[in-house]
Amino acid sequence: MASASSGPAAAGFSSLDAGAPAGTAAASGIKRATVSEGPSASVMPVKKIGHRSVDSSGETTYKKTTSSALKGAIQLGITHTVGSLSTKPERDVLMQDFYVVESIFFPSEGSNLTPAHHYNDFRFKTYAPVAFRYFRELFGIRPDDYLYSLCSEPLIELSNSGASGSLFYVSSDDEFIIKTVQHKEAEFLQKLLPGYYMNLNQNPRTLLPKFYGLYCVQAGGKNIRIVVMNNLLPRSVKMHMKYDLKGSTYKRRASQKEREKTLPTFKDLDFLQDIPDGLFLDADMYSALCKTLQRDCLVLQSFKIMDYSLLMSIHNMDHAQREPTSNDTQYSADTRRPAPQKALYSTAMESIQGEARRGGTVETEDHMGGIPARNNKGERLLLYIGIIDILQSYRFVKKLEHSWKALVHDGDTVSVHRPGFYAERFQRFMCNTVFKKIPLKPSPTKKFRSGPSFSRRSGPSGNSCTSQLMASGEHRAQVTTKAEVEPDVHLGRPDVLPQTPPLEEISEGSPVPGPSFSPVVGQPLQILNLSSTLEKLDVAESEFTH
């Protein structure tokens, strides 16, 4: 029978740690007799990272459970828990809802609550089902769409799992990512849920991960914890570059092994080398992105979270137009029924559009969820970004890690840092180095109330403000006399001694502006004659001194 329990987070996860009772069917694990519990002598693993290993036949195993069996257990468990939850009346989320753990046993022969299946017996646990139902509703995900995306077709395993050794699955419609997480990360997420709930209520538009469910598959005395999140990188869009950025420089370069992959994940030092000028966004988009990053970092800092990254994939639209189209690699959507409703605020563009709307202009062109940008070559880009790896708190282990690293290296360059400093450095790197505002071009028709003063210098080169006159495109054309002199007159009044440059700074080699236009009569002004100007200055000086 399905059972539910509630209690503190630690108590909730203590049930996760307990293995299946000895002698029960669950102790035999998910794998059938045709699959060995561990690597056999004939099939030895050729690659192992953390709990994840791949044998010579290409079969992935996680905690002695094959990937195919794990995918089947996940789909059976989610189908049951979402279906049973739909029969319960909707209500407001209560505090105790964040600590509820529901458990259901799946014997291979089936039961009055579960269907028969061809895997070994396993137990499936669901954490905070009512709270996560609210999160899914907040993002516009209906129960039938959630089930259809995750359970109608086999999950697709992603080979590029990263250095953590986690398993990654993506739903067949590209909507959701399923990731295996460690016990401490799952425990931290459960403790984080009340604050996460409050933050999403205040602002659902965020670059933070969007969590849709937290589950555990218990088999063979092992607990495999998984989290369902939004998918940042659609497979329907070809990515040309991918970066994992922290704002740190210590060991922040992709390894040679990583570079050999089809789409390597580069790091901070690689970005500084590949794109030293940064990525250029229009003013409204840049402002919206930086405000979103600032708000998200403040939330992470309040929870003492650090060591997170900005995952950024770049689609080069100009390169894509020149590349031959391959039907084999192009993603084709499932056409058996209309595409399910997309999760709200699930793309990078949607995550920052709330800020862009407050600022005024919003990019309305369809960019497939990416943020439009350009590189220093002027090539059109689409950026797919999101903050990842937030389930790390600044605990004793991290403090100790930073302490010994700081003794050997510059403390400011180490990625494991106190949350406040980490957030500040992260924002500074993203908004000053990675993303930059496209400089506005000066408009030749823009009018100013008054031009710059004639006495101002343009720089160390000694150019007079006549060069500034040409840049502003405006200057009052007036012929003045001694009787018309006013103390506050600026340009066009060479008879005002305090505002004239020293004579020794003016040379015949000084640049002279081209024709400008008078805002009064709209006629071209005559090019200034430097010799005539000097003569007028001499006359004015003699008149004021006598």
From Swiss-Prot:
Region (Disordered): 442-475, 491-518
Position of the Glycyl lysine isopeptide (Lys-Gly) (interchain with G-Cter in ubiquitin) cross-link: 88
Enzyme class: transferase
Any GO BP: ruffle assembly
Bias (Low complexity): 450-462, 509-518
Regulation: Activated by phosphatidic acid.
Catalysed reactions listed for this entry: a 1,2-diacyl-sn-glycero-3-phospho-(1D-myo-inositol 4-phosphate) + ATP = a 1,2-diacyl-sn-glycero-3-phospho-(1D-myo-inositol-4,5-bisphosphate) + ADP + H(+); 1-octadecanoyl-2-(5Z,8Z,11Z,14Z)-eicosatetraenoyl-sn-glycero-3-phospho-1D-myo-inositol 4-phosphate + ATP = 1-octadecanoyl-2-(5Z,8Z,11Z,14Z)-eicosatetraenoyl-sn-glycero-3-phospho-1D-myo-inositol 4,5-bisphosphate + ADP + H(+); 1,2-dihexadecanoyl-sn-glycero-3-phospho-(1D-myo-inositol-4-phosphate) + ATP = 1,2-dihexadecanoyl-sn-glycero-3-phospho-(1D-myo-inositol-4,5-bisphosphate) + ADP + H(+); 1-octadecanoyl-2-(9Z)-octadecenoyl-sn-glycero-3-phospho-1D-myo-inositol 4-phosphate + ATP = 1-octadecanoyl-2-(9Z)-octadecenoyl-sn-glycero-3-phospho-1D-myo-inositol 4,5-bisphosphate + ADP + H(+)
InterPro entries: PInositol-4-P-4/5-kinase_C_sf, PInositol-4-P-4/5-kinase_core, PInositol-4-P-5-kinase_N, PInositol-4/5-P-5/4-kinase
Signal peptide location: none
Function field: Catalyzes the phosphorylation of phosphatidylinositol 4-phosphate (PtdIns(4)P/PI4P) to form phosphatidylinositol 4,5-bisphosphate (PtdIns(4,5)P2/PIP2), a lipid second messenger that regulates several cellular processes such as signal transduction, vesicle trafficking, actin cytoskeleton dynamics, cell adhesion, and cell motility. PtdIns(4,5)P2 can directly act as a second messenger or can be utilized as a precursor to generate other second messengers: inositol 1,4,5-trisphosphate (IP3), diacylglycerol (DAG) or phosphatidylinositol-3,4,5-trisphosphate (PtdIns(3,4,5)P3/PIP3).
Subunit structure: Interacts with RAC1. Interacts with TUT1. Forms a complex with CDH1/E-cadherin, CTNNB1/beta-catenin and CTNND1 at the plasma membrane upon calcium stimulation. Found in a ternary complex with IRS1 and DGKZ in the absence of insulin stimulation. Interacts with DGKZ. Interacts with PIP4K2C; the interaction inhibits PIP5K1A kinase activity.
Record-given protein name: Phosphatidylinositol 4-phosphate 5-kinase type-1 alpha
Organism (species): Mus musculus
